[in-house]
Amino acid sequence: MEDLLDQVVVELHRARSCLSDPLVFTQAAVIGSILFVFLLGLYNYFLHPIAHIKGPFLAAVTPISLIRALRDIHNPGPDNHHYTKRGTSEDLILRFVFGANNILLVDEGEDHKRLRGALQPAFTAKAMRDQQDITHYHVQKTVERLLEAAMDPSQTISLTKELNKLVWGNVGNLAFGEPATLEQLENHEKAKDLHAQIAPILEFFQYLNGNPILGRAARGLVGISRKVFGLSGNILGKDQLRRHIASQQGQKNFLTAILGAKESSGLSFDEIHSNMLLLLMGGYDSSAASLSAIFYHLLREPQQYKRLQSELHHAYSSVNDITCNSLLSQPMLNACINESLRLVPPFNGHGSHRVTTSGTMIDGVWVPAGTLISADFYSLHRDPSCWAFPDEYRPERWLKEHQGPGTPFENDVKTAWRPFSLGPRVCVGREMALQSIRLAVSKIVYTFDMTLANRDFVWDRDAGSHYMWHDFDIAVTLAKA
């Protein structure tokens, strides 16, 4: 027995001496890692509690999802169950920017109800009517800048940059009673670029989020990173918010509406800051990306642009006659907007939406407790079981004359159109965003003939998306219509 123990000690010493050699240690680490990943993959594919939910092989055996399958249900990770069925959409939530609870970061329940109740007064029908003049002002300023550019029809301009300025100024004005500065816009764009660069890490952290220990560590790292980069302070600092609050007497905007609900909703200052930051960033990103995408699709299909322009010229004798309320009854305008929002939903991606607390049956599939459930807007909007010609820009699918029996779109499932999410998670500012988008698109199309200058740009291929769209720029030449 003693000889055996001596032999074991000798072998352990030999192993330690071998591992002290960097080359041997590296080889052992690599071989051990490969073996671990292989065995983990076997477990995930054959023995994991949701192994019966089939999907792309790589997604089923590892948390690294490199394959997108446009199917009703697929398994994008060994602990994840991803749905594209209507009725299960929910927003991807990241804590990389926001330091306190806001309407997107809290689970549904009393906290979510409390925060939603605090924001709701900012988006009532009366609030929207009160804010129309502000949006008209910013759209008109953009039209005036474009008229100057149109004096040289050979000049190529970035329509995206002009639309970004429009939306940023408008959202800031709606939120605080004064336009947000271009410096804030630059800081926001830098933050968005940073988010795009580290998005794969955040996606992996979301996978870890399902583990009680690793998830806590991942959330801690995200919180530390937020403080290191100081993103929120560069876009809307707390001192800056305090100055806005002090200057709100007699004004009507998002901030005054939220302040009016502060006591009844029990909002802390940090929660007010987080929600105002969300309204500024989310309101800008969703509307700015949507406007660029709308003009991209219209200009890729010039006959659709001309058709919309003709409808507007027929409906209004002057661009000054266009009003927010009258645009609700312009079928081609709303069809073009709806179709672009289908192909390019304002926010995209899937993430750690919720974890099942007990086993449940979803759409005929048994999902065990502890499974992360998520949905993907892009996949939902391109699902061939819900849409005819799912990857094509067909605004006519939204027109009444193309929706009856015998039409190509008779089986379209319009309830699968969820660019602003649904249920308790539906975007609280969706109607305000649509109001601004309709006004901007109608006045610009009414006033200008446009040609897409960078026709080699293909949105689906060239634009990036890590929840927020980025790396897109619609360049145009234009002349007064």
From Swiss-Prot:
Residue positions with a glycan: N338
Topology versus the membrane: Single-pass membrane protein
Subcellular location(s) per record: Membrane
Pathway per the UniProt entry: Secondary metabolite biosynthesis; terpenoid biosynthesis
The keyword Oxidoreductase appears for this protein: yes
Residue ranges of the TM segments: 23-43
This protein's name: Cytochrome P450 monooxygenase dpfgJ
Gene it is expressed from: dpfgJ
